Amino acid sequence: MKLHELKAAEGANKASKRVGRGTGSGLGKTSGKGQNGQNSRSGGGVRPGFEGGQMPLYRRLPKRGFKNIFAKEYAAINLDRLNCFEDGTVVTPELLVEKRVVKKVKDGVKILGNGNIEKKLTVKAAKFSKSAIEKIEAAGGKVEVI
């Protein structure tokens, strides 16, 4: 077989539906839209959520909650992700972004205690979980809240 002899697999290339090209095509006259009515018209159809005049679900249900504009969003990292650093490294949020451990710092970094840490690191972050502090100090490292 040569490159110029390559062919698509049987049934791989399907002709597009050409509607409104005569009754013999099977998709002529009404072009697969049924008889007359709102849905057969150009731009026809109802908006999303419309229930035929019945009070729609999104208006039947009560409003609930609010978005706290003062809420702080932290980039969370588990301890086992910090094993990529060498012994004695000072781990800062900027270094975490540089090494692509975290995409964005947001309002700070929070270190969580999932996994184990084998390296002696000085970790600087906005927040730490209790278990993370215990594990970092047990490995001989230091914790600094910034």
Curated annotation (Swiss-Prot):
Biological-process GO terms, alphabetical: translation
Key word RNA-binding present: yes
Stored Pfam families: Ribosomal_L27A
Source superkingdom: Bacteria
GO cellular component terms listed in the entry, alphabetical order: cytosolic large ribosomal subunit
InterPro entries: Ribosomal_uL15, Ribosomal_uL15/eL18, Ribosomal_uL15/eL18_sf, Ribosomal_uL15_bac-type, Ribosomal_uL15_CS
Keyword terms of this UniProt record: Ribonucleoprotein, Ribosomal protein, RNA-binding, rRNA-binding
Transmembrane segments: none
Region (Disordered): 1-56
MF terms (GO), sorted A to Z: rRNA binding; structural constituent of ribosome
Stored SUPFAM superfamilies: Ribosomal proteins L15p and L18e
UniProt subunit comment: Part of the 50S ribosomal subunit.
Family: Belongs to the universal ribosomal protein uL15 family.
Role noted for this protein: Binds to the 23S rRNA.
HAMAP family: Ribosomal_uL15
Protein name: Large ribosomal subunit protein uL15
